[in-house]
Amino acid sequence: MNITDEGTPVLILNAGGITLGTESRKTMENHDRVEENRNITKALCALINSGEGKVKAHIKNPDYILSKHGIGEDLETSFKNILPSRPLDFKQYQSYFFICVEKSQSPDVSVGKPATIATNLYMRNGASSVEMNLDAAQKFLDNIKVAGGRSPSARPSDRPGDDTQEEGHIQELAAAFFKQSKLTKKENFLFSESKNVEYKSFETKKLLQRVKEILPRTVSAFANTDGGYLFIGLDEKKQEIVGFEAKNCQPKCLESEIEKCIQQLPVTHFCEEREKIKYKCKFIEVHDSGVVCKYVCALRVERFCCAVFAAEPESWHMKDGGVKRFTIEEWIKLLMS
């Protein structure tokens, strides 16, 4: 990605090549579609946060006509997520595609929110980890700032709804399961997934990779809500204990990666204590005919004192002649100003 000098005072940011059109983008390889989407949304985000200009991309498909083929559903969704309240101005000139950004579309840094591709700030919603949008993130951080942090356990008023008792029962069952020192293969367990409980089977040789993929959002979501339990080695459909084999991932290796992942999660504090993320990881033996055959990884995450991010917010701006990512401190300052 680079700035193009075309002899005009308008800033033009070159996003490289792109395949356009609803049908054409559907037939692309997923990796290529995601990479193109990322390049152009990154450029758009940077321009919106930095003033005005144009995003320029070379159209790869030669027969493309903007008015006839559209831009593509994935691009429309990504653009709306960055700038939900205003329509964007798309133009085609020969084999080039332009997105025009005017000052009126750029946030007022004194009162507005920074254009953001992903907040990377998660909460638990039911049995899922859900990313907060900008409004939810701002409210969440504002509440923590006003209170000077979060209490170690949620107040009853923080847990509204008729499902409170059931959630508490599920959490008690998960807590009892966490305390076990030995499990039996194929035995059923009695709790479902919930706001405070998630489990995965991951019966694959790529166990470590899969765990590393889900840990940031799951751990941060638990920490930002009321804490919770993550179990690796439980079958979601049959609700039975399956475990994982040590040959696919040694427990010590998995524990080390979990520790590394949690230590790397970005946090922001509004409290004096500035504590670290509190958690406990253990491995429970799974027995078959009296012999240890597999393991279940059990992770308990405590409610965090302030806010935990799955990764730094993905929000870009123009600085020193290039596209730079906001630091978490810069992003929070803009969001809460």
Curated annotation (Swiss-Prot):
**InterPro entries in UniProt:** Poxin-SLFN/SLFN_N, Schlafen, Schlafen_AlbA_2_dom, Schlafen_AlbA_2_dom_sf
- Null phenotype? No visible phenotype.
Does the UniProt entry include the keyword Cytoplasm?
A: yes
* Chain intervals with Basic and acidic residues compositional bias: 156-166
List the Pfam families hit by this protein, alphabetically: B3R (PF17057), SLFN_AlbA_2 (PF04326)
- Which segment of the chain is annotated as a signal peptide? none
A GO BP term here is: negative regulation of transcription by RNA polymerase II
Q: What does this protein do?
A: Protein expressed in resting T-cells, which is required for maintaining T-cells in the quiescent state. Acts by promoting cell-cycle arrest of T-cells through inhibiting the expression of cyclin-D1 (CCND1).
- Assembly: Interacts with DNAJB6; promoting nuclear translocation and ability to promote cell-cycle arrest.
Would you tell me the protein name for this molecule? Answer: Schlafen family member 1
